[in-house]
């Protein structure tokens, strides 16, 4: 069957095929690099955390893309003005309790953040699922959210120092301020 082609034609075909393969591989590598840069820029430290958790950048990128797809389907919504005001009043009460009952206030702040997330359309679920979901819209808050939650739910929370509790409240305040101002993307 190849008898109809000259050696020069076969060599030209082989070279053309090799060039096409090289172009395809280079194109794929450029695509992957761009995707990695984009996800790293979008998710920040959460990207690095996903790589550590999943063992490879490829697996982490798949999981982060899955998060984005999941969150797009959640039906997130803005708070009504009355809801926003109710959450602000509740937050102020939690903050006021911190002076006399810091451990209780930190636990209440954690619960209030969870309630606020549900009001915004995020589903109830485990902390890790909530964290994964909100990392799509608020990746820069994740480190604060994880640290504050670790103190709020720590067994033996009584061992948390006043300074740790104060930092947790500040972290929750940062999260609260961002979430209560949420505007649907």
Segments the model singles out, each with a brief description of its role:
Residues 2-3, 175:
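Intrinsically disordered, low-complexity segments used for protein-protein interactions
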Residues 3-38:
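N-terminal signal-anchor transmembrane alpha helix of single-pass membrane proteins
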Residues 9, 92-95, 129, 171, ...:
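Residue-identity detector for glutamine
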Residues 27-30, 46, 144, 171:
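Intrinsically disordered, low-complexity N-terminal regions enriched in serine/proline/glycine
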Residues 34-137, 141-160:
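Elongated extramembrane "stalk/tether" segments
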Residues 150-185:
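Extracytoplasmic/periplasmic C-terminal soluble domains
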